[in-house]
Amino acid sequence: MSITFGELVGNFILVTGSVIVLLLLIKKFAWGAIESILQTRSQQISRDIDQAEQSRLSAQQLEAKSQANLDASRLQASKIISDAKEIGQLQGDKLVAEATDEAKRLKEKALTDIEQSKSDAISAVKTEMSDLTVLLAEKIMGANLDKTAQSQLIDSYLDDLGEA
């Protein structure tokens, strides 16, 4: 079975004509629907791309806002820590100053108490000495002294003791 050139050309023309008729029929009856489907799909893809871009921009804005909030929180936490350190330092300094003042006050009170005790002891010694002096003087003189003479004698005796 051999095919001649004429048959080949005839088949070619027949197939080409059939394809052209088929394309014309598709264009007349189905092309509008196919074009509509392709247009709808193109619009859907375009909307999806736009939504993806909007979502990306929204995510970037949200990320920037979150980062700004995080930075503000870090700054606020740092300020709180700094303020707490400063307050702690001030309170520590205040406590040290109060303790120093209290120590000075206690030292001054102790010195005052020592001076008072010393004065009381000297006064007690003077009184004791005056009594002894009076007794000694009475024995030596053989007579009782009145208060004025007693005071003068005591003062004189104490002055002599103070110089010694």
Curated annotation (Swiss-Prot):
Topology class, membrane: Single-pass membrane protein
Protein name in UniProt: ATP synthase subunit b
Quaternary structure, from the entry: F-type ATPases have 2 components, F(1) - the catalytic core - and F(0) - the membrane proton channel. F(1) has five subunits: alpha(3), beta(3), gamma(1), delta(1), epsilon(1). F(0) has three main subunits: a(1), b(2) and c(10-14). The alpha and beta chains form an alternating ring which encloses part of the gamma chain. F(1) is attached to F(0) by a central stalk formed by the gamma and epsilon chains, while a peripheral stalk is formed by the delta and b chains.
A GO MF label: proton-transporting ATP synthase activity, rotational mechanism
Family to which this protein belongs: Belongs to the ATPase B chain family.
Protein function: F(1)F(0) ATP synthase produces ATP from ADP in the presence of a proton or sodium gradient. F-type ATPases consist of two structural domains, F(1) containing the extramembraneous catalytic core and F(0) containing the membrane proton channel, linked together by a central stalk and a peripheral stalk. During catalysis, ATP synthesis in the catalytic domain of F(1) is coupled via a rotary mechanism of the central stalk subunits to proton translocation.
Places the protein is found: Cell membrane
Transmembrane segments: 6-26
Keyword Transmembrane helix: yes
Name of the gene this protein is made from: atpF
Record InterPro entries: ATP_synth_B-like_membr_sf, ATP_synth_b/b'su_bac/chlpt, ATP_synth_F0_bsu_bac, ATP_synthase_B_chain
GO cellular component assignments: plasma membrane; proton-transporting ATP synthase complex
Assigned keywords, A-Z: ATP synthesis, Cell membrane, CF(0), Hydrogen ion transport, Ion transport, Membrane, Transmembrane, Transmembrane helix, Transport
